[in-house]
């Protein structure tokens, strides 16, 4: 299972929710979705994982491989990243 960190009022995150909805409609549930802008505990977890690699949300993360994607991405970027994760 992957994790998608987002901010509730983040416009870039809203677009990525749409992308995840479409992806998961095809492939099943892949992501835990974690809101961090209004949840200090989850924000601290994200900061520990991020290690200043991205510095914000949207942040897609695979805890098994410690790989990630940052920011608003294109559908093909997510598709390629997921394939690289050997689903």
Report the location of each language-model feature.
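Local sequence-structure signature of Cys/Sec-based thiol-disulfide redox active-site neighborhoods
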Residues: 1-32
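Non-catalytic, surface beta->alpha helical segment in thiol-disulfide oxidoreductase systems
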Residues: 61-87
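Structural motif
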Residues: 40-46
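Structural micro-motif
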Residues: 47-61
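Generic recognition of short, well-ordered alpha-helical segments
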Residues: 14-18, 44, 73
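Residue-level recognition of beta-strand->loop/alpha-helix junctions
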Residues: 35-37
